[in-house]
């Protein structure tokens, strides 16, 4: 019977390991922050180009950024969120706009 208990313990250990390995990844909010210089049209362009929003939804989010100071553009895994933040910030700098994109844990 000792062997049966060993197998049960092993099975439980495997289940625990698999459960831990299959936990959903941490998610992060990608946020655009308002400033007084970036044109609204550029913000709409960013939302369409990097977040695949249609012009209507991009306009709604741009207005949220403008009037509320910031808006969530999407929620992604850490790697995707970090990549989007870096791409948006790089694109803004290349176009000489101070638009800031950040991330925070969801």
Curated annotation (Swiss-Prot):
GO biological process, one term: proteolysis
Family annotation (InterPro entries): ClpS, ClpS_core, Ribosomal_bL12_C/ClpS-like
Coiled coil: none
Similarity section: Belongs to the ClpS family.
Subunit annotation: Binds to the N-terminal domain of the chaperone ClpA.
NCBIfam families hit by this protein: PRK00033.1-3, PRK00033.1-5
Role this protein plays: Involved in the modulation of the specificity of the ClpAP-mediated ATP-dependent protein degradation.
Protein name: ATP-dependent Clp protease adapter protein ClpS
